[in-house]
Amino acid sequence: MLTITSYFGFLLAALTITSVLFIGLNKIRLI
């Protein structure tokens, strides 16, 4: 149970970081 929770937490963190980087790159390109 703990392994599944930590895995989903890591997946969520990775997805958040990726989306933030993607949005940042798009904003830089727009400017």
From Swiss-Prot:
Keywords: Chloroplast, Electron transport, Membrane, Photosynthesis, Plastid, Thylakoid, Transmembrane, Transmembrane helix, Transport. It is a single-pass membrane protein. It comes from the Eukaryota. Pfam families: PetL. One of its GO terms (molecular function) is electron transporter, transferring electrons within cytochrome b6/f complex of photosystem II activity. InterPro entries: Cyt_b6/f_cplx_su6 (IPR007802). The chain crosses the membrane at residues 4-24. The keyword Transmembrane applies. GO terms for cellular component: chloroplast thylakoid membrane; cytochrome b6f complex. One of its GO terms (biological process) is photosynthesis. It is found in: Plastid, Chloroplast thylakoid membrane. Component of the cytochrome b6-f complex, which mediates electron transfer between photosystem II (PSII) and photosystem I (PSI), cyclic electron flow around PSI, and state transitions. PetL is important for photoautotrophic growth as well as for electron transfer efficiency and stability of the cytochrome b6-f complex. The 4 large subunits of the cytochrome b6-f complex are cytochrome b6, subunit IV (17 kDa polypeptide, PetD), cytochrome f and the Rieske protein, while the 4 small subunits are PetG, PetL, PetM and PetN. The complex functions as a dimer. PANTHER family: CYTOCHROME B6-F COMPLEX SUBUNIT 6. Belongs to the PetL family. This is Cytochrome b6-f complex subunit 6. The lineage of its organism: Eukaryota, Viridiplantae, Streptophyta, Embryophyta, Tracheophyta. The gene is petL.
